[in-house]
UniProtKB/Swiss-Prot annotation:
Cited function: Acts as a chaperone.
SUPFAM superfamilies, per the entry: Actin-like ATPase domain, Heat shock protein 70kD (HSP70), C-terminal subdomain, Heat shock protein 70kD (HSP70), peptide-binding domain
Segments for region (Disordered): 578-612
Record has Cell inner membrane as a keyword: no
Coiled coil: none
Cross-referenced NCBIfam families: PRK00290.1, prok_dnaK
UniProt organism field: Thermoanaerobacter pseudethanolicus (strain ATCC 33223 / 39E) (Clostridium thermohydrosulfuricum)
Protein name, as recorded: Chaperone protein DnaK
Induction: By stress conditions e.g. heat shock.
Alphabetical keyword list: ATP-binding, Chaperone, Nucleotide-binding, Phosphoprotein, Stress response
InterPro entries reported in the protein's UniProt record: ATPase_NBD, Chaperone_DnaK, Heat_shock_70_CS, HSP70_C_sf, HSP70_peptide-bd_sf, Hsp_70_fam
Low complexity composition bias: residue spans: 578-596
Phosphothreonine PTM sites in chain numbering: 174
Length: 612
């Protein structure tokens, strides 16, 4: 069995790790970095870019660059590039393909299985979409685990004794808080809460709006209507936010941001940490509610928590750290890398599933209550939030009208009392119920949540034994046909990427060959005949012409001819040198250099040694 990798598929950055020699190791990407921007771009020529190279060109190509796609997982959102529409699953799969390829290059073997993390507060549709993205990328997703739980694994792997910990996870696009009890290899989630639309992107947006509003006041131009200017604002906002984690003031300088009839316009302003904190204070304060909710659900007080673990890049913001300290009454633990902990935890869980790591038991929970719509549009819960998974629960319902022969089961997820205010996961119909007065038929509805947090629902008429069993597939999930089509397209992209890489390597080799040929001709000088020089120059020119075109076979053929021409010249020169030095072997001559003195000296030394 090959290695199972752990992947943190983040809103702004992603990370991949693996267990090696009993220790989790973060895998660097092809560019040498330990995290990869969750950015995908398409050039006007149709080439696909993923990661740092995609992020780098975003300013000049904003319309064809896709960022923070994770925020749209589990929705019917589509990205249109040229005439093609891409789902969030497809874009996420491109990021996963890049991580998979980097892992394969690092490990030197094919990777086909992974554990992928999701925010603890992700609903069923979002979890299913993440699993589909893995399949499209060519990965068998062995387990979907919650990000705070993964971080707790990373923290607690080498800890002894029982501890109650809180994981406060504020990333680029999502916020989670989970409370766990850990000890003796058991990681039990007691409660979880969060907000799927709160993170560093929102902090950036506050800076963007502040810059754009001030610019509009001064010049009457709204930079948010100019895609290229807006992308420059986004980049500047992100940099300013990062700098203000260590500095108290930062300068935002964007020359030639736009122009009007009066000439070019520039931005050159200072943003203080105090002003930044004023801009984001309500966002940071909104994390307090979920923290208190999780504590309440777990039946704990802040003083009962032994350690508070900060995860996610946004927890580097000083105001966030101060807020956590204020509500918990203790300094947060900073002995864990907030960017890498989730991927490390995923790698640990991957090793557990692969049988490499023993004596670890992970008991996670469902973040939201599950149930069905009943008479009057009421949401009737069958499984309460924070129930340990996997779990299975049943409840008996009956018909609402006389002689009702079918019932529609409307499956929902959420905490609101009315069905319409919760998230619809799906609907299905149980038919064939014998006509009877209302209240007589008995219909057993069973909810089954697997270890991935993905829901399966069945309904059974206890009178006839007739049942209907489905895995929830809401309207935003992909059909099997769509997934297969996307898998095939992903393979095509992989093939295109492979060919592109091969083309670059062939071109680089050809360039290198020209350089070596010209250098060697210069070094050999008059040892080459004029005819040989003409032939080599002719072949060099042929390679140069081939490089100007797009025919890779032509470049390979021209390079091969140049190599052959040089081989002929080299062979003649070395044979000639060998003949003039008493018939020394070609190998010996070549090994000692090209001058007669060197060759003669080598042979002389060998004879001297033999005589001894």
């Amino acid at each position: 069995m090959g290695k199972v990798i752990g992947i943190d598929l983040g809103t702004t950055f992603s990370c991949v790790a693996v267990m090696e020699g009993g220790q989790p190791v973060v895998i660097p990407n092809a560019e040498g970095a330990r995290t990869t921007p969750s950015v995908v771009a398409f050039t006007k020529e149709g080439e696909r870019l993923v990661g740092q190279v995609a992020k780098r060109q975003a300013i000049v190509n904003p319309d064809r660059t896709i960022m923070s796609i994770k925020r749209h997982m589990g929705t019917d959102y589509k990205v249109k590039i040229d005439d093609k529409e891409y789902t969030p699953q497809e874009i996420s799969a491109m990021i996963l393909q890049k991580l998979k390829a980097d892992a394969e290059a690092y490990l030197g073997e094919k990777v086909t299985q992974a554990v992928i993390t999701v925010p603890a507060y992700f609903n069923d549709s979002q979890r299913q979409a993440t699993k589909d993205a893995g399949r499209i990328a060519g990965l068998e997703v062995l387990r979907i685990i919650n990000e705070p739980t993964a971080a707790a694994l990373a923290y607690g792997l080498d800890k002894e004794g029982n501890q109650k910990i809180m994981v406060y996870d504020l990333g680029g696009g999502t916020f989670d808080v989970s409370i766990l009890e850990i000890g003796d290899g058991v990681f039990e989630v007691l409660a979880t809460s969060g907000n799927n639309h709160l993170g560093g992107d929102d902090f950036d947006q506050r800076i963007i709006d502040w810059l754009a509003d001030n610019f509009k006041k001064e010049y009457g131009i709204d930079l948010r209507n100019d895609r290229m200017a807006l992308q420059r604002l986004k980049d500047a906002a992100e940099k300013a936010k990062i700098e203000l984690s260590s500095a108290t003031v930062t300068n935002i300088n964007l020359p030639f941001i736009t122009a009007d009839a009066t000439g070019p316009k520039h931005i050159d302003v200072n943003l203080t940490r105090a002003k930044f904190e004023e801009l984001i204070s309500d966002l940071v304060e909104s994390t307090v509610g979920p923290v208190n909710q999780a504590l309440s659900d777990a039946g704990l007080k802040p003083s009962d928590i032994d350690k508070v673990i900060l995860i996610g890049g946004s927890t580097r913001v000083p105001l966030v750290q101060e807020t956590v300290k204020r509500i918990m009454g203790k300094e947060p633990h900073k002995g864990i890398n907030p960017d890498e902990a989730v991927a490390i935890g995923a790698a640990i869980q991957a090793a557990v599933l692969a049988g490499e790591v023993k004596d670890i038991l992970l008991l996670d929970v469902t973040p939201l209550s599950l149930g069905i719509e009943t008479l009057g549009g009421v949401f009737t819960k069958i499984i309460e939030r924070n129930t340990t998974i996997p779990t299975r629960k049943s409840q008996i319902f009956t018909t609402a009208a006389d002689n009702q022969t079918s019932v529609e089961i409307h499956v929902l997820q959420g905490e609101r009392p009315m069905a319409k205010d919760n998230k619809t996961l799906g609907r299905f119909i149980l038919s064939g119920i014998p006509p009877a007065p209302r209240g007589v038929p008995q219909i057993e509805v069973t909810f089954d949540i697997d270890a991935n947090g993905i829901v399966h629902v069945s309904a059974k008429d206890l009178g006839t034994g007739k049942s209907q069993d489905i895995t929830i597939t809401s309207t935003t999930n992909l059909s099997e046909e769509e997934i297969q089509r996307m898998i095939n397209e992903a393979k095509q992209y992989e093939e295109q990427d492979r060919k592109k890489k091969e083309e670059i390597e062939i071109r680089n080799k050809a360039d290198s060959l020209i350089y070596q040929a010209e250098k060697t001709m210069k070094d050999l000088g008059d040892k080459m005949t004029q005819a040989e020089k003409d032939e080599i120059n002719r072949e060099i020119e042929n390679v140069r012409k081939a490089l100007e075109g797009s025919d890779i076979e032509a470049i390979k053929n021209a390079s091969e001819k140049l190599s052959q021409a040089f081989y002929k010249v080299s062979t003649r020169i070395y044979q000639q040198a060998g003949g003039q030095t008493g018939g020394a072997t070609n190998t010996g001559s070549a090994g000692q250099g090209t001058t007669q003195d060197n060759v003669y000296e080598a042979n002389y030394k060998v004879e001297d040694d033999d005589n001894k």
